[in-house]
UniProtKB/Swiss-Prot annotation:
Function: May mediate the uptake of pyruvate into mitochondria.
Protein name per its UniProtKB record: Probable mitochondrial pyruvate carrier 2
Predominant cellular place of this UniProt entry's protein: mitochondrion
Bilayer topology term: Multi-pass membrane protein
Coiled coil segments of this chain: none
Family: Belongs to the mitochondrial pyruvate carrier (MPC) (TC 2.A.105) family.
GO annotations of cellular component type: mitochondrial inner membrane
InterPro entries in the cross-refs: MPC
Record localization: Mitochondrion inner membrane
Swiss-Prot/TrEMBL GO biological process terms: mitochondrial pyruvate transmembrane transport
Alphabetical list of Pfam families matching this protein: MPC (PF03650)
């Protein structure tokens, strides 16, 4: 058994001993849920929220500096995984919600890119000139 596994088990035991007793009655079932905070099904989406933060931060960037491919990938994977999270067992609404917002941030950026390119028909020429200078 690796040291990371021992650390994880020790943290779960400490949580069961110190956190679980002080939880309100409505939160206790969530603590031991199959997608609760003692599983990767909780922590993976929690960490994935940073993608939404990055997408929101990109709203401050000029649309001509956004990547069409990156935002297409965020939109597509967000859509696919949102659906998948609703058909797996256990159904993971938390993971589904984070993927839904990944899809939304990707879509918002794709709309910004499309709007920029529509408003600036010579965008491709400008891009080529900037890369050669």
């Amino acid at each position: 058994m690796g040291p990371h596994r021992l650390l994880y088990q020790a943290l779960c035991k400490a949580g069961d001993k110190f956190v679980y007793p002080v939880l309100p009655a409505f939160a206790k079932p969530a603590w031991n849920h199959a997608a609760g905070p003692k599983t990767v099904f909780f922590w993976a989406p929690t960490i994935k929220w940073t993608l939404i933060g990055a997408g929101l931060a990109d709203l401050a960037r000029p649309a001509d500096k956004l990547s069409l491919y990156q935002n297409s990938a965020l939109f597509a994977t967000g859509a696919i995984w949102t659906r998948y999270c609703l058909v797996i067992t256990p159904i993971n609404y938390y993971l589904s919600s984070v993927n839904f917002f990944v899809m939304c941030t990707g879509l918002a950026q794709l709309c910004r890119i499309a709007h920029y390119r529509y408003q600036n028909p010579d965008w491709e020429t400008k891009e080529i000139m900037e890369t050669h200078n």
